[in-house]
């Protein structure tokens, strides 16, 4: 019986190393698989982070483009309104010129007449409204400035030096600092 028991023990002891080897090999294989899975997981995570960065950068660019377009549209809208006001102002200039001419003519006939006074009040109110909207007359003082004045003739003048404004023939106007129409003037030329 001891022999039988020894044989079984020998048989089991021979099987044990094989089982241990198989178990160790299995554990090694599992460890390698875990490392592979961990490596794949890291690779997937890196890919995800790269894609996230790309998408985030695209989002930031699109958002910046959107903000730029929004600002450009606001600026274009503002410029369109500005242009519309400028066009209206240009259309009003002949009316203003006609009122100025009527006032001058009425003042030549009778400075104290009701018509002259009415035209004066009308011109004052018109200039107030125009100034409120950024339209103002160009100053025509002594100095000629080609940015604001258009010299359409030169005249001899004993009172004025060369290049000085002698007479304003047509009033000039500015809209928010930009010249709508330069003032038509005559300048002194004394040779």
From Swiss-Prot:
Region annotation (Disordered) maps to 1-22
Q: Which Pfam families match?
A: GrpE (PF01025)
PROSITE patterns associated with the record: GRPE
**Cellular component GO terms held in the UniProt record:** cytosol
Arranged from A to Z, the UniProt key words for this protein are: Chaperone, Cytoplasm, Stress response
Task: Give GO BP annotations, semicolon-separated.
Answer: protein folding
Location of the protein in the cell: Cytoplasm
Which Gene Ontology MF annotations are present? Answer: adenyl-nucleotide exchange factor activity; protein homodimerization activity; protein-folding chaperone binding; unfolded protein binding
* Free-text function comment from the UniProt entry: Participates actively in the response to hyperosmotic and heat shock by preventing the aggregation of stress-denatured proteins, in association with DnaK and GrpE. It is the nucleotide exchange factor for DnaK and may function as a thermosensor. Unfolded proteins bind initially to DnaJ; upon interaction with the DnaJ-bound protein, DnaK hydrolyzes its bound ATP, resulting in the formation of a stable complex. GrpE releases ADP from DnaK; ATP binding to DnaK triggers the release of the substrate protein, thus completing the reaction cycle.
Q: Which family does it belong to?
A: Belongs to the GrpE family.
Complex formation: Homodimer.
Protein's recorded name: Protein GrpE
Q: Which species does this protein come from?
A: Helicobacter pylori (strain Shi470)
């Amino acid at each position: 019986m001891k022999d039988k028991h020894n044989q079984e023990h020998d048989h089991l002891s021979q099987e044990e190393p094989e089982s241990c080897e198989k178990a160790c090999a299995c554990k090694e294989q599992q460890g390698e698989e875990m490392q592979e899975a961990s490596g794949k997981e890291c690779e997937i995570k890196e890919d995800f982070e790269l894609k996230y960065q790309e998408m985030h950068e695209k989002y930031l660019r699109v958002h910046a483009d959107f903000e730029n377009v929004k600002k450009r549209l606001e600026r274009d809208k503002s410029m369109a309104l500005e242009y519309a006001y400028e066009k209206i102002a240009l259309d009003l200039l002949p009316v203003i010129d006609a009122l100025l001419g009527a006032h001058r003519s009425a003042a030549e006939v009778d400075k104290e007449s009701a018509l002259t006074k009415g035209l004066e009040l009308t011109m004052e109110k018109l200039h107030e409204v125009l100034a409120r909207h950024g339209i103002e007359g160009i100053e025509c003082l002594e100095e000629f400035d080609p940015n604001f004045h258009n010299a359409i003739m030169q005249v001899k003048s004993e009172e004025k030096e060369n290049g000085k404004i002698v007479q304003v023939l047509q009033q000039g106007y500015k809209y928010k600092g930009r010249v709508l129409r330069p003032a038509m003037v005559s300048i002194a030329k004394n040779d």
